[in-house]
Amino acid sequence: MWLIVGLGNPGETYARTRHNIGFRVVTELAQRHHLRFTHKRAKAEIAEGEIAGQRVALALPQTYMNLSGQAVVGLRQWYKIDPATELLVVYDDVDLPFGVLRLRERGSAGTHNGMRSIVALLGSQVFPRLRIGIDRPPVAWNLADYVLARFTPEQEAQLPEVTRRAADALELVLREGIVVAMNRINAPPPKPEKKRGSETSDPSAESADHAGGG
């Protein structure tokens, strides 16, 4: 089975903040498959069911962001999963442009306190994660204030599309596996076709590394 955890802060005060986009995406996935958050265990709200032929538990930790690891470790023990192959964490990332998705099998927690808590309590960085870009804060902004603020009106208008693509990415992992999903999700967007008669570019001049950071 898969344990899919969306990171965020509980309560209406934080519901529409940048830091809660992980909650939004996992909630979108649950609604899409008519799964309801009817269980509470290990300091998290849980929706259980089946997606793409896989048993899943979708989790929204209720611990506040900085203590997310408490919920994840408790759920790992409850469901008896292997984090390296059966845990997928969804969260916001200030180091990615708004709306950009990155899927990884492992990596550091970076500056994200929720991920730091998970890595510390699991004792491992080896577990899949889907990062969703929320942009860097403006120079004058404190990072904590930025992630706990709402999106701009322009970004808010694009959020339904961003959450849809992120939920699609989670479905792809469940349907095709993490490696196939990474190859598709992390690939650069296709370049526009050149007009007939224009010079072709030298493919050797293009970088082969599109993976980005951990």
Curated annotation (Swiss-Prot):
Record InterPro entries: Pept_tRNA_hydro (IPR001328), Pept_tRNA_hydro_CS (IPR018171), Pept_tRNA_hydro_sf (IPR036416)
Region listing for Disordered, in residue ranges: 184-214
Catalyzed reactions per annotation: an N-acyl-L-alpha-aminoacyl-tRNA + H2O = an N-acyl-L-amino acid + a tRNA + H(+)
GO biological process: one example: protein quality control for misfolded or incompletely synthesized proteins
Organism listed in the record: Roseiflexus castenholzii (strain DSM 13941 / HLO8)
Site (Stabilizes the basic form of H active site to accept a proton): 92
Annotated gene: pth
Active-site residue list: 19
GO CC annotation: cytoplasm
Pfam family, one: Pept_tRNA_hydro
EC number: 3.1.1.29
Superkingdom in the source lineage: Bacteria
Name of the protein described by the UniProt record: Peptidyl-tRNA hydrolase
